[in-house]
From Swiss-Prot:
This is DNA-directed RNA polymerase subunit omega. SMART domains: RNA_pol_Rpb6 (SM01409). InterPro entries: DNA-dir_RNA_pol_omega, Pol_omega/Rpo6/RPB6, RPB6/omega-like_sf. The lineage of its organism: Bacteria, Pseudomonadati, Pseudomonadota, Gammaproteobacteria, Chromatiales. The RNAP catalytic core consists of 2 alpha, 1 beta, 1 beta' and 1 omega subunit. When a sigma factor is associated with the core the holoenzyme is formed, which can initiate transcription. Belongs to the RNA polymerase subunit omega family. Its EC number is 2.7.7.6. HAMAP family: RNApol_bact_RpoZ.
Length: 107
């Protein structure tokens, strides 16, 4: 696990503010499953992001990339539940009089 310093990263960045923006965006991408350009070496995503910046694999152009759409899992789950409930109600209404009779039951 190689130590990464701010000075190592600043050789590829204009200033510390930009380093923070690029590093945080790249760390977020790594945490969400993006492929790393360097070995993980059992490091956290922030350290890997800084190592990528220091090695020149990631630069300021990452700030121009469009963010991935955020999935609203709660809204999606709620919509699916409503759809299933509506489907269940529709199924329950079909063939109400067609229930199978049990032996010994007069109809």
């Amino acid at each position: 696990m190689a130590r990464v310093t701010v000075e190592d990263c600043l050789t590829n960045m204009d200033n510390r503010f930009q380093l923070v923006l690029v590093g945080s965006k790249r760390a977020r991408q790594l945490a969400n499953g993006a492929e790393a350009h360097v070995d993980w070496d059992n490091d956290k995503p922030t350290v890997v992001a800084l190592r990528e910046i220091a090695d020149g694999h990631v630069g300021r152009e990452i700030l121009e990339e469009q963010p991935e759409p955020v999935l609203d899992f709660e809204a999606e789950a709620s919509a699916l539940m409503e759809e299933e409930a509506a489907k269940g109600n529709a199924d329950a209404g079909q063939g109400e009089g067609d229930a199978p009779k049990t032996p010994g039951q007069d109809g």
